[in-house]
A protein has these predicted regions:
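Active-site and NAD+-binding cores of ADP-ribose-processing enzymes
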Residues: 2, 25-138
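Extended catalytic/binding region for NAD+/ADP-ribose chemistry, centered on the ART fold
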Residues: 1-29
Length: 138
């Protein structure tokens, strides 16, 4: 997180989207983490959410060809602007799976609205990552 930037809860709207994010980031580590992970299912309600699609990228200064790279500065600035405008959520395309991710802007999220844990699942992230091409090591 950039200094003075907005705190967010980064989620995926589908299980495989969350697994893809987890696998992408953990797959960059050496050695690969061997500990089993826990995937949590949440029920989240927001009041004022904006949807940003790939069609909006050019106007927002996001290079669609480099979207999957780890270059978060522009996305964080857009998140900061959404927070300033009073949004409590942003729906964005996943860079790693065909789904949307919900970014909850913590400071703007009404504490009376639910962010409820509805499920927890132990996952073998390495097996999932291998099966979906995120890691290739045996």
């Amino acid at each position: 997180m950039l200094r003075e930037s907005t705190a967010v809860l980064y989620t995926s709207t589908v299980r495989d989207g969350a697994m893809a994010e987890l696998s992408f980031h953990l797959g960059m580590l050496t050695p690969l983490p061997v500990k089993q992970m826990v995937l949590h299912g949440l029920q989240i309600e927001t009041k004022k959410t904006i949807r940003i699609g790939r069609k909006d990228f050019l106007a927002l200064g996001i290079d669609d060809n480099r979207f999957a790279e780890i270059a978060y500065d522009r996305a964080q600035l857009i998140g900061d602007a959404a927070a300033f405008l009073g949004y409590d959520g942003i729906l964005v395309p996943s860079a790693r799976w065909t789904c949307e991710n919900l970014v909850v802007i913590c400071d703007n999220h009404d504490i009376s609205l639910p962010i409820d844990l509805v499920s927890s699942e132990d996952v073998d992230w390495q097996a999932w990552a291998r099966a979906h091409g995120f890691i290739t090591t045996p």
